[in-house]
Amino acid sequence: YKTDHVHYIVIDIKFSTLPLRADGIHLLNSGNYNFYKAQLRIYTEALQELQGFTPSKAFILGRRWNYHSKGEDFSGLSCFDKLGVIDFEKVDINVVDTVKKAIEWVRLVRNEGKEWSIDPPSRPELYPNMCVDSGEWNDVKKEIANKIGDITQIWYCGIKNREIGFLNGIKTWR
């Protein structure tokens, strides 16, 4: 990673095997790695505030690595063989927008969330998604969904179907 600027870059350490893409360089979006990529983007933005320059890449040092390319499996047992590369300008450009939207959402919840209602939901984001397991919140979701006749209770109707219904003035399956 070369540039004309002298600056710091983020290298995070994870005690896990790095799942690399077929190029053997960039990290796959598997398991927790989407979250790790977002985490490193936030670290990179914080670093940018300090040094006035945003590095285009961040790295993860894992305990080992592996990837599959052209019918062959490759792997290494040393954490120093390869770093997992996160490229915010090319391969992982979507991470930048995802983090930006997540930060906007957190700020919106902090500033306006106290005014919202879940019974009935006052925003589309507050409707339950019955197609997803939410652990300990499943009973609460089910209660709300039953009360409002949520569209995602219908077999094969997810959030996209609910959004289509909302656009056509349909708020319930009843």
Predicted features, each with a name:
Residues 11, 32, 138-140, 148, ...:
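Generic detector of bulky aromatic hydrophobic side chains
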Residues 57-62, 93-155, 159:
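Mixed-charge, glycine-rich, non-catalytic linkers/tails in nucleic-acid processing enzymes
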Residues 147-149, 157-174:
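Accessory alpha-helical DNA-binding modules that contact the DNA backbone or grooves
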